[in-house]
C-alpha cells in the first residue's frame, strides 16, 4: 500500500488497516517459526505498511 493511498483513508480506516496488518504479521511470523513461510519478503512489506500508516496518523495528529 502506497502512502498516497493511505492518506486518502479516514482515521478509522487507517486504524483498521493497521490492525489487519498486525494480525497478518503475527501469522507470518508464526509460519516462519514453523518453517511454512514461502514468501519471506512479505514480512518486510507488512512491516513497512504498518510504519507508513503510523507515520500518516502521526502527521495528521500534529497538524490538528
Swiss-Prot record:
InterPro entries documented for this protein: Ribosomal_protein_uL29, Ribosomal_uL29, Ribosomal_uL29_CS, Ribosomal_uL29_sf
BP GO terms, sorted: translation
One Pfam match: Ribosomal_L29
GO molecular function per UniProt: structural constituent of ribosome
Family: Belongs to the universal ribosomal protein uL29 family.
Alphabetical UniProt keywords: Ribonucleoprotein, Ribosomal protein
An example Gene Ontology CC term for this record: cytosolic large ribosomal subunit
Gene: rpmC
UniProt keyword Ribonucleoprotein present: yes
Protein name listed in UniProt: Large ribosomal subunit protein uL29
